[in-house]
């Protein structure tokens, strides 16, 4: 018993000693592990518990729900600020004051012009009625003008030709078109002038209120105010009301290359439209001549300008062009290009009416144009502007309140200074012993890889969704409801980014602390934006300033909140300070993103049948999400979980996807307040094909139907069953441009079209085309001289045969320009009256062929008057649903072989 008792005591003593030794050993092992971990990466241990466990400290983890809600509310608040700035069209009202622009008077001009109706070049409405109205108003303005000024008026009717690298390239010829030119100058005259340009013509079947009658109305009112002003002018102001811009910039070419006043012009302001109302955006300046941007910055009362828009437009991804190109390329004159960009859904449609343009839109445009023209008319720089032709400008407005502008070379210096700051910031981290020894570089590089993987996989995901939706025939479901695109593609992108980073956090960085990872991924985002800054600056893009903004403010924010972040961890105070520091880049980012979608979304409804709009929009939206989420990635590593957020995003995306697939969202709208019509072009055409002997080998007639978006006629067929795939048009392989009367060379954009059989059309003014002469030239080429007569708009097509080349012609600069696909396209128009169009082409024949050397065709387009209509065309138009806009006219097509 005693032995047993003694043994028990010994055992208790030994057990206690063993426990103490075990605890000491465990403590020693823990310290060793901690030391080893420190050697591996002290930074990775931020926020660890005192016992060295691997779990994250609760106090450093942000609440998932609260963080997600805070970020969502933050972005919504910024979006609300952007919307507020866009709705505030004028900063101060001056309408009605003596010597100020009066929008009510300008609206009166606008309503009178649009009341005339569609104004196509060559029509009575354009060449007589509109011109008469303009001359009447100019005469009244002249009667009220101040004796300090002199007003001269000239009606120009130029004839000319040029080639243009637009829509794949083609040549333009015009005859007897109309320009109304007004010169306002000091009584003693002036040796230099500033040009203000608008166009009063419109596309067929549209009143053209925004494009471009409102600009002409603004110019009339500016002319009235300036001519009545008691303030002396140093230079002249030439107001050009051109009557053939919609004919691919013909009237501006006629003015700048032929008018005697053109030699006075030192700079210009071009007023255009790609939408209806809203703010007019400065989207092109120069080339070079930074003094022009400075003039706008100094004078404009309601600025709205962006060098980003300029570089996007000049990249060619927007299928449009303006008179700016003509003055720049053919006149070698610098200028400013402005355009209304809001509500492009009704641009070039019957809905482009005067009542849709707000009075404040007219007021702000008038205030700006008047102020800038006054500034330039008294500028010492204008007369010797060539001396100031150096470099380009970085310019951007801040919510329409002011414009910041500086030379691009200064911008490059600033950008590289910002890059150096980032290099110092990251270099300092790498030089810290704890980071050098902790494989910070490895974690950083892995973080970059994870970020790029998340972006790539998210882009692939939304593209798969977009392609699937396109294949099942549900494209453009977001066209009438843009939030559908956000709920479908935006949520998918965000969910995939969060998912990839959550996997990295759980399986790769499982032993790293939240705070360490939060800082690490801030650094990776900073580095990515810095890399973009370097690339854009090196390539000479002025829009690199945006990347600089997305580097400077986040870096300053990080430096300001770093101590608080280290001391207190990721808490509400940190989130508030962090979001406050990101205010400027995110606000301006959303501001630009709005502009991008305001321009591109309507364009995708008229971009042709070959470009899947969902793929384009999904890509743009995914890139925007990547940019906006870049500095929010850090929160993925600071929250306690992301499960609910991912599930919510997936749920929203899945529900939207199912609704889209079921056809719940119809793309188009006939809502009178905000119509978003489907564009369809109808041409009742009679075609005649001749062989080499001149005999007719084929003759047919029908209504040629082109849908200008990716959905084709799928939504129209239920309303008009006869328009179905059984009448799909077939390409005539041996004929230029597939044997159809293309108004412009957009055949590569619209390959899906329909040909509904219909009776032959017989216009009262039929087109005539004949070979005048065929001559063999001394240099072994064949010169073919042709003569054509017909309506105000015609198209001429040429295709050379094997062994033949088109060496020269009497059009443009004499050098034939091929269109996309290898054929030659000539756009012809004339004013109210014109003589026969005579021209020649010269064909070099290296090898004679039995089928001849060249095939030519001519199409006549009847865009105005009674000739534009046919009973079959009218009957078909009536069948189209009210959510569509069918633009219709009559055409003839004749093909010949020589």
Curated annotation (Swiss-Prot):
Q: Which UniProt keywords apply?
A: Acetylation, Disulfide bond, Endoplasmic reticulum, Glycoprotein, Hydrolase, Membrane, Metal-binding, Metalloprotease, Protease, Transmembrane, Transmembrane helix, Zinc
- Gene Ontology CC annotations of this record: endoplasmic reticulum membrane
Protein family per UniProt? Belongs to the peptidase M28 family.
> How would you classify this enzyme at the top EC level?
hydrolase
Q: What is this protein called?
A: Endoplasmic reticulum metallopeptidase 1
What biological processes does GO assign it?
Answer: cellular response to oxidative stress; endoplasmic reticulum unfolded protein response; proteolysis
Q: Which InterPro entries match?
A: ERMP1-like_C, ERMP1_1-A_TM, Fxna-like_M28_dom, M28_fam, Peptidase_M28
**Taxon lineage:** Eukaryota, Metazoa, Chordata, Craniata, Vertebrata
Database matches in SUPFAM superfamilies: Zn-dependent exopeptidases
- Binding positions for Zn(2+) 1? 199, 211, 272
Q: Which residues form the active site?
A: 245 (proton acceptor)
Q: Which gene encodes it?
A: Ermp1
Q: Which cofactor does it need?
A: Zn(2+)
Composition skew (Basic and acidic residues), residue ranges: 29-41
For the ligand (Zn(2+) 2), the binding residues are 211, 246, 348
